[in-house]
From Swiss-Prot:
Its main location: cytoplasm. The keyword Cytoplasm applies. The gene is PUP2. It is found in: Cytoplasm; Nucleus. GO terms for biological process: ubiquitin-dependent protein catabolic process. This is Probable proteasome subunit alpha type-5. The proteasome degrades poly-ubiquitinated proteins in the cytoplasm and in the nucleus. It is essential for the regulated turnover of proteins and for the removal of misfolded proteins. The proteasome is a multicatalytic proteinase complex that is characterized by its ability to cleave peptides with Arg, Phe, Tyr, Leu, and Glu adjacent to the leaving group at neutral or slightly basic pH. It has an ATP-dependent proteolytic activity. Keywords: Cytoplasm, Nucleus, Proteasome. Pfam families: Proteasome, Proteasome_A_N.
Length: 232
């Protein structure tokens, strides 16, 4: 039984791959990230875990720009995320050079889904890690319309109107289910998503311990701490 629990590419007698289940648990240990999609924009809002007053808040990054119209947020092992970000950026650039067009958000998701399942490759040149990714991702983008997806370590991805990942995801998703219809204008939506995030944060919310990005048809705008403070 222990062999099944250690193996990354063997099913147990119950039809489970335990290493993927462990990765699914790891992704919920990180700070909370919220994604909300409307007809005009997508917002990503994340808690930044500041461990010391001596720490530079700018050194903690929760959102990464993958391409002009695609942003990634995560919860879980940050080192895994950096590998995913690099691979994603390279893939998007390659797609544009090959086809002469911006990549669609779902095309990137399909690539990431296949990438997440390459942990058991015998060919080391193809293998990314020797274990599943220990992160859950939220992808916000705008191609023909606003897009919001979540991808878990099993390679499964789903489109959402609103989604939360991380340690506070259950509480946040309960709030989003009841209040999603109240998200309309950008200013109101920013205030609302920050208020929701504050309810699952151990520390008092401030401009330095949250990160916010807004994706529209025109741009992916990362709000400065001063801009965030306006909505707190």
């Amino acid at each position: 039984m222990e062999d099944f629990k250690q193996s990354v590419n063997t099913y147990s007698s119950e039809g489970r791959i335990h290493q993927i289940e462990y990765a699914m648990k790891a992704m919920n240990l990180g700070t909370t990230t919220i994604g909300v999609r409307t007809k005009e924009f997508v917002i990503l809002c994340s808690e930044k875990k500041i461990l010391s007053t001596l720490q530079n808040p700018k050194s903690v990054v929760k959102h990464y720009k993958i391409y002009d119209h695609i942003v990634l947020g995560f919860s879980g092992i940050s080192g895994d995320t950096k590998t995913i970000v690099k691979r994603s950026r390279d893939f998007c650039i390659s797609h544009t050079h090959m086809y002469g067009e911006n990549i669609s958000v779902e095309r990137l998701l399909k690539y990431l889904s296949s990438l997440s399942l390459r942990f058991g490759e015998e060919d080391e040149a193809k293998m990314i890690f020797r274990r599943p990714f220990g992160v859950s991702l939220i992808i916000a983008g705008f191609d023909t319309e606003p897009r919001l997806y979540s991808l878990d370590p099993s390679g499964s991805y789903i489109s959402y109107k609103a989604k939360a990942i991380g340690s506070g995801h259950e509480v946040v998703e309960g709030i989003l289910e009841n209040e999603y219809e109240e998200y309309s204008g950008l200013d109101q939506s920013l205030r609302k998503v920050l208020c929701t995030l504050s309810k699952v944060m151990k520390d008092k919310i401030s401009k330095d311990n949250v990160e916010v990005v807004v994706v529209t048809q025109e741009e992916s705008k990362f709000l400065t701490p001063e801009e965030v403070s306006v909505y707190l």
